[in-house]
Amino acid sequence: MALMAVLLPGALAVDLNVDVGFYFKQSRGGTCTLASAAMMLRRRAYLDGMDSWVDVTENGIKSTAWSGGLSHSFTYNDMHVGYATLPSGKAAKTGALVSILAEHPEGIVLYDRTRPHAVLLTDYTDGVFYCSDPSNGVASGRVPLSAASISIGGASCYWYITEDGNDDGLELLEEAVQAEEAAAETETTAETEAAAGEESGSQDWWTSLFG
C-alpha cells in the first residue's frame, strides 16, 4: 500500500480545490470563454496525472478551440469538449449545475449572455458555487461565484469535457488502489477470525478441564 501511494499522481492525493497553479486571467478582452476553457482543460490534465498540465494555456488551445469565439465542439490533447444549454429558471439551473459538477470535478465553462461573460465554474461545496473568473476586475484564483462577474440566474449555457482519452492510466491506478485496500481488508478480517477461533479453542480447553 505504501508503494501504491508513491505511484499515485498528485491528482489523487491533492484536492482539486487547492490551487497549485490552475488559474490565470484572460490575455485580452473578448477571450473569457477561451481562458476559462484552458483552465478547465488544465485541471482535467492534472486530474489525469499528466505532467504537461502546466503547458495548457489560452494561446495553446486557441488554434483548435477558437473560431471568432469558443467553438461548440473541439478536441485538445485527446480531451473532447462539447456545448450544452441550461434549463430555464434559477432553481432548475442550480440543480442542473450541482449534478453536472458532481460528474465533472475539473469544472465547466459557464456563460452568462446577459453580461456577456464566462467563468470556470469549479465546484459546489457546502452549498456554495465556486469559480475562477478570468476577468482582471475580479480576484485571482478560486472565489465564490457571488464575487464573480456572472450569476446563476443569468447563465444560459456551458462547455464541458464530454470525453477524455487520457484517463486510462488514472483508472488503472485507482483500480489497483482499490484492489490493495480490498486485500488489506480481507487480511485484517482473516486475522480477526483466526484470533476469535483461538480464543474459542482456549475457552473450550479450559471448560474441559474445570467444567
Please provide the spans of the model-predicted regions.
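Soluble non-cytosolic domains of exported or imported proteins
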Residues: 26-35, 91
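Conserved active-site-adjacent core of cysteine acyl-enzyme catalytic domains
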Residues: 15-20, 38-180
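Sec/Tat signal peptide C-region and signal peptidase I cleavage site
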Residues: 9-13
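A short glycine/serine-rich beta->alpha loop
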Residues: 18-28
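Ser/Thr/Gly/Pro-rich low-complexity, disordered linker/stalk segments of secreted
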Residues: 171-211
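Bacterial N-terminal signal peptides
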Residues: 1-6
